[in-house]
């Protein structure tokens, strides 16, 4: 097929690519890893945050903040164009990252926050290796399962498997999809934990190659498991807020290489399905 317009002849394959790219420019995105922590709040007011979301086509977020006040503010804003899915952050201050899993006061924090009545998950939390075997971590896992909450775990594979051993019914969003775990191993873990494990893609290495294009391994992984991935910004430091536009421009660039149905699921469809939300 060829299209002739203004004297220009475009082969059908080129035209299809242009249509796909335009579609991904318009696609809605759900940011499944958004922190509104203490540090950026003096620099980025709620109105400025809203403007950032609008210009990047963000229509939903997982909000997880340190302290949780940042998430409270995002919930209280009640912006009609944005679905906010709040997660409990088990941190009061940044140093809790290193100790939360043995601090009984953190469990009290989780219970106190949960009493607000709107939370859908716990995390993002950091846990590595055998630290996940602590009694407190098991209590958190069981608490989540009993209340149908997701966990958002920044962890290595060893800790991930321990979380599932604590309670096989747990539902985990794996922050960064293991950073550098091989695509083949990611596929194995998805198969082993069908309906219980999803991968969030911020900071994930290897998705694109030196030419900026999707690698064959990740193209194949997205083809097989497009229903298991989520996008995220991970605004853990102010620089990530500064780079927000660039982060999502890059996501849109490689989403445009995927079939439209795969791109739509990864961009927002999976998050909407997981949290029982409808498109606006």
What are these regions (language model features)?
Residues 34-45, 94-101, 209:
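Acidic/histidine-rich helix-loop elements
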Residues 69-150, 198, 205-206:
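Active-site gating/metal-coordination segments in enzymes
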Residues 35-37, 66-67, 89-93, 125-128, ...:
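Active-site beta-loop-alpha junctions enriched in small/polar residues
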Residues 2-5, 10, 20-33, 41-65, ...:
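Mid-to-C-terminal alpha-helical segments outside catalytic/metal-binding sites
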Residues 40-41, 114-188:
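Divalent metal-binding pocket/active-site signature
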Residues 30-34, 61-63, 84-89, 122-123, ...:
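Hydrophobic faces of well-ordered beta-strands that scaffold small-molecule active sites
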Residues 45-48, 68-76, 104-110, 157-161, ...:
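Alpha-helical scaffolding within the catalytic cores
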Residues 175-280:
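H/E-rich (His + Asp/Glu) clusters that bind or coordinate divalent metals
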